[in-house]
Amino acid sequence: MELPDPVRQRLSNLSLTVFGDSSRTGPESSDAADNEMVSSLALQMSLYFNSYFFPLWWVSCIVMLHLKYSILPDYYKFIVVTVVILITLIEAIRLYLGCMGNLQEKVPELAGFWLLSLLLQLPLILFLLLNDGLRNLPLEKAIHIIFTIFLTFQVISAFLTLKKMVNQLAARFHLQDFDQLSSSSAAVRRVRQCTEEL
């Protein structure tokens, strides 16, 4: 299952704008730039452990919500149920995009993972953790803190991985451009030699 082309293109453009290294004027002088793996082992391990932690988080959230549902005000009942549903849906998409983007070194997928983590998931979990009106139980605070640590680490490591990926793609592009330029100049030299012989 791939992202639609317009979404991939927009995420690629956003990634180049946000993560591109504008201080560089040319490609890095690395002979192994084409073969270097830039996916992050730390990010992948975090995603792996997060995929096992999330069902535990979800079950404990539902159990704690069931225990305190009767003492919550009506508006908080609606808000908490909505937030848990949103977190569940976003987390499934987020983990998929993170794994695909990191393992296959796809910048748009990893950028989507980073944006979902930073702009949606982190604020929602911080709302559940820091809102006093929700009357959090000790187990809830503990699981929300662990989830927040996972998210914070993933946001930071995804940013660093995206920066490396974008810089490597830019270096590959510049090397391909240079190769095309050198091959076209070789063709011009051959044409000149042929015309001189005539």
From Swiss-Prot:
Keyword Glycoprotein annotated? yes
* Record bears the keyword Transmembrane: yes
| GO cellular-component term (any) | MKS complex
The protein's UniProt keywords, in alphabetical order, are: Cell membrane, Cell projection, Cilium, Cilium biogenesis/degradation, Glycoprotein, Membrane, Transmembrane, Transmembrane helix
Look up the coiled coil feature and give its residue ranges. none
Checking InterPro entries in the record gives: Uncharacterised_TM-17
What is the protein's major site of localization? membrane
Cellular compartments annotated: Cell projection, Cilium membrane
Residue positions the entry lists as glycosylated: N13
* A Pfam family this chain is assigned to: Transmemb_17
**Listed transmembrane segments:** 47-67, 78-98, 110-130, 142-162
Entry's Gene Ontology BP terms: cilium assembly; non-motile cilium assembly; smoothened signaling pathway
Membrane topology category: Multi-pass membrane protein
| Subunit and partners | Part of the tectonic-like complex (also named B9 complex).
The job of this chain, per UniProt, is described as: Transmembrane component of the tectonic-like complex, a complex localized at the transition zone of primary cilia and acting as a barrier that prevents diffusion of transmembrane proteins between the cilia and plasma membranes. Required for ciliogenesis and sonic hedgehog/SHH signaling.
| Family to which the UniProt record says this protein belongs | Belongs to the TMEM17 family.
> This protein is called what?
Transmembrane protein 17
Q: Which gene encodes it?
A: Tmem17
